[in-house]
Amino acid sequence: MNKERIIQEFVPGKQVTLAHLIAHPGEELAKKIGVPDAGAIGIMTLTPGETAMIAGDLAMKAADVHIGFLDRFSGALVIYGTVGAVEEALLQTVSGLGRLLNFTLCELTKS
């Protein structure tokens, strides 16, 4: 029996690898993500993973958003709130990580 193996590697460094805004998510998607009735969802992935805790703090201080999911091991962060609040939180979090911690940044994307 052949088993497929997947190896996930992180490169050393400080990086925001994804910052994405989902405006007006469908009911099914929001429910699957675990944030039903969200006007918008923000998704971030960060390296090193522990940065998700700092990003969550920055996001909540930047705008009226809530944390839907945070994983300090994988570096995943999901926030939710209104479209304007989530967009502002993502923008301020990305710029804050660059300014305060000298992270390599990515552009905010939207759908």
From Swiss-Prot:
Gene Ontology CC terms: ethanolamine degradation polyhedral organelle
Description of what induces expression: The first gene of the 17-gene eut operon transcribed from a single promoter, induced by ethanolamine and adenosylcobalamin (AdoCbl, vitamin B12). Expressed at low levels following mouse infection, not induced in infected macrophages or in spleen.
Primary location: other
Transcription regulation keyword on record: no
Pathway terms, separated by semicolons: Amine and polyamine degradation; ethanolamine degradation
SUPFAM superfamilies in the record: CcmK-like
Compartment(s) where it occurs, according to its Swiss-Prot or TrEMBL record: Bacterial microcompartment
UniProt-listed GO biological process terms: ethanolamine catabolic process; generation of precursor metabolites and energy
Additional comment: The need for a bacterial microcompartment in EA metabolism can be bypassed by increasing the levels of EAL and an acetaldehyde dehydrogenase (not necessarily EutE).
Subunit description: Homohexamer with a central pore; the hexamer is probably bent by about 40 degrees rather that symmetric; bending depends on Gly-39. Interacts with the N-terminus of EutC, targeting it to the interior of the BMC. Interacts with the N-terminus of EutE, targeting it to the interior of the BMC.
PANTHER family tied to this protein: BACTERIAL MICROCOMPARTMENT SHELL PROTEIN EUTS, ETHANOLAMINE UTILIZATION PROTEIN EUTS
Name this polypeptide is given: Bacterial microcompartment shell protein EutS
